[in-house]
Amino acid sequence: MPADGYANPQLLVSSAALNERIGPAGPLVVDLRPAEEFARGALPGAVHLDLFGLSLIDTDPAPMRAYLWIIEHLLATRGVDADREVVVYDECSGVRAARALWFLELFGHTQVRLLDGGFNAWAVEKRKISHEFVAPVATEWHGSRREEVLATWRDVHERLGKANVAIVDTRTPEEHHGTLVRAARGGAIPGSIHLEWTHNLDGAGCFKPAGELRTMYQRIGVTPEREVVTYCQGGYRGAHTYLALRLIGFPQVRNYLGSWREWGDRLDLPLETPTPPSRT
């Protein structure tokens, strides 16, 4: 994956570049895959942290504080420290690693990268895979929250109908159109623009080049002049599009952590059921 064209190329690291630096004196490498995949082999020295399923469905202040404390604590138990670079990965440039990167940016970490192509790229390029696992060394790390990358239901509600805000639905077409219902109600946040997160990746599971990403988002009216709020079902796929937009230099991007599971369950919040495009 060429770095040319990305406004923030430091958010990604290639397999070749990581291979030159991996080791005790190098970055902390965190594997976000399921435990059974990690047990079959991982990058040398990687520590395991599966955050999948640890979701928040109420972004009011009290539950938000408790939830983020848990995530921050889990990251610290795996050795995250403010002074050490962190590289996150999963099977490809996927939602698990993107969500971990978003969490770390939310907590103010300034040296976090995603392994582009993930474990698959590492394996295809025949780099060393380890079956000797290292126990993580916990730290006392405490982040400093960057509220500007986080959206709550109140933040989204306040932005409805504003021309300078783009709300991007990263779910499947079926979820967006309300034919696949995964909450008390189906549908979409009013005025949201739909583009499924998978369009951020190429056929090899790496992020598309910067020019392709810019053109793709410009075509649907998502431009750097607008504040962007991403959402999905629980903040996973939304974090992926957050990263894609960060890569191409969007200055104001938030991920709605509660996403549709919260919005769809709250009967007091508005929704729409967009008409699927005609197949004629």
Name each region found by the language model.
Residues 31, 90, 116, 171, ...:
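Short beta-strand/turn micro-motifs composed of small residues
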